[in-house]
Amino acid sequence: MMVLRQRRAAALFLFAFIFLMPVSHAHSREKADIKTLVIVSHPYPERSVLTKGLQEAAESLEGVTVRNLETLYGYDTRRINGDAERKMMRENRRVVFIFPTHWFNITPMMKAWLNETWGSVGPGLWQGKEMFVVSTAAGGSSTYGPDGRIGVSLADVFLPMKASALHAGMTWLPPLVFESASSDRLPSYQHQLIERLKQ
């Protein structure tokens, strides 16, 4: 009888170990596969819905450091600390830029960040790192693409970013761009961003 009880106890312990232990980790944060620096900018933060939502998605992952330029520096481009930002660049293998397309360009603060942080970057200084652009745009097919008003794709708008990445020796990753962006589709945008950051 004692042996039978011991066997039952051992079986229950084994069952609990195999089937219940993983449940205790079910709510742990997902993790980015590569140590990642995310630079976020929006020219009108108080109106930001999509950019804010994408920032929150990035912040949900371990291994990701998020820096919102307007939160850190306001709108004063002279306050950007190039030394501190370069240190952050050196500590991460991938840099992600999240912003709304602003007059077919990046935001003013993001351009100032690049000027201050990369202003003295010579060819190949960020060798081995990756650049990933994430952007939203109000315009859709009537604006972008071969039949659109400007005749180029939204991804083409970011060619200066691609040139900067390649000049610095970085790998240019395919951008994640959302045309005709809508707050109704924010959960989908967040999911897509998280999946890309986990790669």
Identify the residue ranges that each predicted region occupies:
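Short beta-strand segments enriched in small/hydrophobic residues
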Residues: 35-42, 134-135
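Glycine-rich phosphate/pyrophosphate-binding loop and the adjoining helix
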Residues: 30-37, 55-61, 160-199
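Boundary at the C-terminal end of the N-terminal hydrophobic targeting segment
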Residues: 26-28
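Bacterial N-terminal signal peptides
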Residues: 11-22
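Structural motif
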Residues: 74-83, 184-189
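Bacterial N-terminal signal peptides that target proteins for export
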Residues: 2-11
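A short beta-strand-loop structural module common to alpha/beta enzyme folds
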Residues: 61-78
